Structures are given as C-alpha cells and as structure tokens.
Amino acid sequence: MMIKWIISILTMSIMPVLVYSSSIFRFRSEDVELCYGNLYFDRIYNNVVNIKYIPEHIPYKYNFINRTFSVDELDNNVFFTHGYFLKHKYGSLNPSLIVSLSGNLKYNDIQCSVNVSCLIKNLATSISTILTSKHKTYSLHRSKCITIIGYDSIIWYKDINDKYNDIYDFTAICMLIASTLIVTIYVFKKIKMNS
C-alpha cells in the first residue's frame, strides 16, 4: 500500500518537469527548422552575382512580418545576410521570432565553398539558438552552385537580459512544489483515517 503512494507522489512530482522539458524541446526543434534550406548562387557576369535562399520548412504557426536580404562581394568572396521576422498566427502583432542567416561563399571556376551561421532568437521563450557550418564544398556547374544548408554544431542558450527570464523555470518549480504538497497532505490524511 505504501509503495503505491510513493509511486503516485513521484509521478506527480516528475510530471511538471516533463511537461516543461517537452515544451522547450518542441519550441527549439520547430525553430531550428527555419535554418535549413537551399541556397542558390548564380554568377551572372564577372561582377554580378545572384543569391537566393529558400527555407526547407516554415512551421505552420508562424507568419512572416518582414524580410531583409543583403549581398556584398569582394573578389571571389560573397558575403550575405538573410534576416526575417515572424509572429505567431494567433498572437500579437509584435514579432515573436527573429532569424538571421549569414554566411560567406567563396567560389572559383569549378567549385564553391560555403560557411554559414544561423541565429534564432525566440522572444516567447527567451531562448537563442546558434547553428554553424564550415567549409562545405559544392561543384560549380555553368556558373551556378546549389547549396543544401546543413550544420556542424548547434548551441542553445537562455537569454539573461530578458524581463521574463526564468518564468518557465519558476512555473515548473511552483507546479512541482504544489503537486508534491497536495499528494503528501492527501497521503497523510489517508493514513490518519486508516489508523
């Protein structure tokens, strides 16, 4: 009988932590999908290049607010930055996600080499993600290079300057304490009634 109560106390104690962990993982995995896609590079003339980035997947819960794209070229190096602001479909008008994809593309007559980094700032969870990729080489065919963007490393970190910092941690801890107290009081009352 006592083992049954101990198992229920442990279950009630662990549940809020599991809910918190799964929600953070869900936010991270959906956001990271915005960094994967195809980068099309086309050298039109000697001094003119055309770069186009198409994300592989856009999570259904986001709408685009604004998009920026800049390209600079020096010799055979092309530097590009692609930034976009997204908001939740059913949220406020303010952006809830900022994604910045930047990179360096170096090309010659037969190949192109790409270094890419992607920064995602989720304003809802105050979590930022950095993805980096180095020296991916692709063949140049008729002055065109199609790059499939993948990453070597992923770093997640929680922003410390946000006014809502640790609100999810605080909520999970409060739920853990409350559920443990409720179950403990219930167990003690049951034990008193049975004795």
From Swiss-Prot:
Membrane topology field: Single-pass type I membrane protein
Q: Where in the cell is it found?
A: Host membrane; Host cell surface
Q: Which residues are glycosylated?
A: 66, 115
* Spans traversing the lipid bilayer: 167-187
The residues forming the signal peptide are 1-21
Protein family: Belongs to the orthopoxvirus OPG172 protein family.
Name the chain's protein: Protein A43
Task: Identify the species of origin.
Answer: Variola virus (isolate Human/India/Ind3/1967) (VARV)
